[in-house]
């Protein structure tokens, strides 16, 4: 989960086409690096999943509550228009989105459950709170599933094959092939596959983040998704863990510590 948060922070200065930097030789962290809505919602979903105790209806309500609470606590984190309206709606119904927000916030689901089937079920619940379009659900499930597979010892070829066979994403592309024509887009179907490819082509945790940002596009969300996967596969260097936590406010750090305690108890 902390890898996803760092990915968000690393990608934040390069979001949107006019800020994209399509090379890997950028400062990993700078004065412009900051957490965004991706981090806020990652923390919110983690707390909601813990409160939900693996029960679908309870989890739906808990995730909905936490997302609205944290979203209002951080009103200027960078939410989209539809999501912002949902945060303040009297009746917060899902609105059929297939945006990549469902995938950016789901990292904790890849860690909190003991089976792939349960991981997929809970990822679906977290998406359906807002992103109940099939592509929105698929993006969240694919992200959580890859995190689960990465942390449970599966190889990159195994992960690639699973994604292709289960979700139908095209994994037979390279970062060099994607980069020239890739632009800012916020759909799951045009962000999640690219984020997974950035991980598959990497040689380390940091290299995965650099791959993701170098593609361009919705760089903070892309790197957030990639970072969550890369942490599960490679681990995360202690100095980067420390630097990430230093850049977070106390309540988000507390949400992370609650998550870490829960995965330590399993």
What are the residue ranges of the model-derived segments?
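Structured, active/binding-site neighborhoods that engage oxygen-rich ligands
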Residues: 1-266
């Amino acid at each position: 989960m902390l890898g996803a948060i760092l990915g968000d922070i690393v990608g934040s200065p390069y979001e949107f086409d006019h800020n994209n930097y399509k090379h890997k030789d950028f400062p990993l962290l700078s004065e412009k690096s900051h957490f965004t809505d991706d981090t806020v919602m990652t923390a919110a979903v983690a707390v909601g999943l813990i409160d939900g105790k693996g029960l679908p209806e309870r989890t739906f309500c808990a995730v909905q509550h936490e997302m609205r609470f944290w979203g209002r606590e951080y009103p200027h984190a960078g939410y989209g228009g539809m999501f912002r309206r949902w945060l303040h709606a009297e009746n917060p119904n899902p609105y059929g989105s297939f945006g990549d927000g469902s995938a950016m916030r789901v990292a904790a689901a890849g860690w909190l459950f003991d089976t792939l089937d349960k991981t997929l079920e809970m990822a679906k619940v977290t998406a359906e709170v807002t992103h109940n379009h099939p592509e929105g659900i698929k993006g969240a499930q694919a992200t959580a599933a890859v995190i689960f597979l990465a942390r449970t010892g599966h190889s990159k070829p195994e992960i690639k094959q699973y994604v292709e066979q289960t979700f139908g994403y095209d994994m037979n592309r390279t970062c060099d092939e994607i980069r020239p024509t890739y632009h800012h887009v916020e759909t799951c179907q045009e962000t999640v596959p690219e984020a997974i490819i950035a991980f598959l082509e990497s040689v380390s945790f940091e290299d995965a983040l650099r791959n993701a940002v170098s593609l361009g596009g919705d760089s903070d969300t892309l790197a957030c998704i990639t970072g969550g996967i890369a942490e599960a596969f490679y681990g995360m260097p202690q100095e980067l863990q420390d630097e990430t936590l230093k850049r977070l406010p106390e309540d988000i750090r507390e949400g992370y510590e609650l998550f870490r305690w829960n995965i330590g108890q399993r």
